[in-house]
Amino acid sequence: MTETAFLKLFVAIVITFILVLPEFFKTPKERTLELSCLEVCFLPNSTYPLSSFNFSSVAFLQPAEETQTIMGILPNHSSFQSFAEICQGITSGLPMCSLCLVCESKGDVDFTSQEQTSKGLVMRGSKEVKASDFYSPCEYFNVTVALLADPVKEDTTCTPEGHPGEAIALDEDPVREKSLNHTCRFMKNTDNCTHIFLHLEMDVKSVTCSMKITWYVLVLFVFMLGIIFIIYKILEEHRRVWRRQSHNYKSSSVLFRGHDSGKLSTLNVRVIPGYPWTIWTRDFDE
């Protein structure tokens, strides 16, 4: 590979590196989640469906984060009256019941990536009312959202485990969600608003993993290419110096040979004893 072709390849890789770089720092886009929720009260031997409602929220979803919190407000909604009536019918042995909020999305929730196969959104969670919130004018829902590959086949039921005098824990999918503690209490003045806290859990490990692998391979490739380029330049400089020195040596050798061929012939004088004359002889050097 010639030096010109090598430089062209290096420039092309650097340009590709610069073009791919903004993809890792782009601003998240707005996504609207429209959910249809159903409140269900779970008792040890029966299940009571409560009122349903719709919920819409504009969220800034960042695929690089696995968990996000979205807060929405539903004014003028309260199903706690019917829920309280159901709880009043419980015997004194089990003075508590659990509420499971099951939600499903109406629109497209393919917000993680085009490669994401999830087409549905199922939420599970609970109503949790603490003693300090006994006279609170709002109902508080703490809901966990999980992307599901096939929400139709997913089991959205909650199995309560009742213990007298204690909060009831819902045994849910241990892979996707964690168990939550739920307490059924009576609240007053619940006609004003309902606060929904959504903890969105996105399955983005596969997407971010491929992005990180591509990023690291690209950085490593550019780094190795830079090292090869530096080594190539060093060897080229050494080769150029060696050629210059070899050329100078050849030039001086040719000049030295030219001077030897043009040397003058020397005369040798031999003297023979006993003779009054001297013999002059000439030796010619080729």
UniProtKB/Swiss-Prot annotation:
Residue intervals on the Extracellular side: 26-214
Cytoplasmic topological domain residue ranges: 1-4, 236-286
Cellular component aspect of the GO annotation: membrane
Locations listed in the record: Membrane
Annotated membrane topology: Multi-pass membrane protein
Broad class of where this protein is predominantly found: membrane
Transmembrane regions: 5-25, 215-235
PANTHER family: TRANSMEMBRANE PROTEIN 156
Protein name: Transmembrane protein 156
Organism: Rattus norvegicus
